Amino acid sequence: MTRYRNAHWWILAILPLIALAFWPGYFSQIGTSSVAHHVHAAGGTLWIMLAAAQSWSIATRRHALHRALGRAVFVVVPLFVAGGTLALVAMATSAVARTDPFSAAFGARLATVDMTSVIAMPLLVRDALAHRRHATRHAASMLATVLLVLPPVLARLFPSLPGFPPSFVAACDTGQLAAAAIALTLWLRDRNAGRAFAVVAALQSFQTAIFALYPGEAVARTLAATPPFPLATAAALATFAMLWTAWRPLHPLVRIAPAV
């Protein structure tokens, strides 16, 4: 695989951006953060590190290590989904309860937008597993998942830029569209094997639209009324099963004899 041979350096560059973006709201008060936020942070960080390690291992032809690390998706991806689900419920609960002005204004919309990313991420990984014999498509689907984490990171960093308007909506829209532009550019480099990037570009454009047009109150109320840990457990188990069917495709119990 030569097309994405340096992708791991770009992935690793996201980690310090995450630290800067989430320092005020999470890392600076990590001791008082909720379990939901800890699981969410752990799942996201582990996934980025795994994606970087997978890119590096295959670029340096460490095929045995690449295959061994590949099995970690059955732990890290369900953890990512479980953490994302817990964070969604927490965000929705704050939005419904209007615990603070930010949650009251944006919590329901953000929960709706983030829910689509939590759903899309394991679907992209499943596509990567299902096409693991096609190196470029496999890599593109894996790398596309990393672009899903960019919008919330960029939305927290853009307001610190000189001259950027002091608007959370503008920061969110700019973050979404910047990530979509990156995904679209990567897709244009390879419109066949890189179709996962087109999916992410379309998703992030859709997220920009629903953030602006859909208040998300019904979604927030539904999430807030759902017990978080049973929901997160069910989501993690469903994710594991979905990945396993791509890793070990089901074979028919009865084989049809060839025509004579």
Locations of regions flagged by a protein language model:
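Alpha-helical membrane insertion/targeting regions
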Residues: 1-260
